[in-house]
A protein has these predicted regions:
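Peptidoglycan cell-wall recognition and remodeling modules
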Residues: 42-54
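Alpha-helical segment that forms one wall of the substrate-binding/catalytic cleft
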Residues: 63-116
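Surface-exposed patches in mature extracellular/periplasmic domains of secreted proteins
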Residues: 28-32, 43-46, 73-79
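Structural recognition of the beta-strand scaffold that forms the well-ordered cores
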Residues: 32, 53-56
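An amphipathic alpha-helix signature
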Residues: 13, 59, 63-66
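Export/targeting segments at the very N-terminus of extracytoplasmic proteins
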Residues: 1-40, 104-116
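Secretory-pathway/luminal and periplasmic proteins that interact with or process carbohydrate-rich
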Residues: 38-45, 64
């Protein structure tokens, strides 16, 4: 299965502002959270967990958030790839898993999902 990557969304602050507008979450709250979680670095990775990206989403939280809210923000093609396994964990088959998880490094996707 081929999944189209979403192009880079521009500056981090601009992405957070757009996410604030689209989700209704306070811009300053999202900015402070991004500063605290990643020092505004969209490529941040935690050394001791799967937490990654601007808002340091761990894998399961990211997958669940994209599954629940992705479609209403233009990420439906990714949300459709996510399913809940028999053990209750969120899963994505094959190489599409990395594509979905790598959205955590896209400032727009991460900011929008953080707003949810």
């Amino acid at each position: 299965m081929t999944v189209k990557a979403i192009p880079s969304s521009g500056g981090v602050e601009a992405a957070i502002r757009r996410a604030s507008t689209s989700t209704g979450v306070d811009f300053d709250f999202l900015m402070k959270t991004a500063r605290r979680e990643s020092a505004m670095n969209p490529n941040a990775r935690a050394p001791t967990s799967s937490a990654s990206g601007l808002f340091q989403f761990i894998e399961q939280t990211w997958l669940g958030t994209v599954k629940r809210h992705g479609a209403k923000h233009g990420y439906g093609q990714y949300a459709d790839l996510i399913y809940q396994g028999g053990d209750g964990r969120w899963q994505v088959r094959g190489s599409a898993r990395n594509v979905v998880l790598d959205l955590r490094f896209d400032p727009q996707a991460a900011s929008t999902m953080a707003g949810e």
